[in-house]
Amino acid sequence: RIQDIVTALAYLDSRDDVGRRSLLGLGSAGIYCLLARAMAAGVHRTCADLSGFDPASDRCWLERCFVPAIRAAGDVRTVMALIAPGHLLIHGAGGGFPTAWARATYRWAGRPDRLTRFGKRQTRANIVEWITRI
């Protein structure tokens, strides 16, 4: 699934009739979108609805997004380090989401304003408003 997202982005990047590309992962696609963004350059904005996904839980990784050795590789901490300082909206994350670490990463990247984190899931209207900002 992650590779499919990266491949789709590469295809869009190859087209002259496509402008800015943003990623929006809703429901179970939120974590895949977040992981794919770490491997894709040139994405304008990324919005990941984690739908309660708890990156501190082995069970979550096993049941919802099995990636061998992801925890040993730094899980979402490494992902956010690769995404920063890109625009990132994360919402609906489980209790184990490393919010303080995410904020520190964006501060170190010099763009703390580009990370938006909400505990609750956002409405579609809020997401559309955020993702279409210039």
Can you say where each PLM-predicted feature lies in the sequence?
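Primarily recognizes the serine-hydrolase "nucleophile elbow" in alpha/beta-hydrolase
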Residues: 3-79
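Secondary-structure boundary motif
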Residues: 14-17, 39, 85, 104-111
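Conserved strand-to-loop "acid loop" that flanks and positions the catalytic carboxylate
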Residues: 84-95
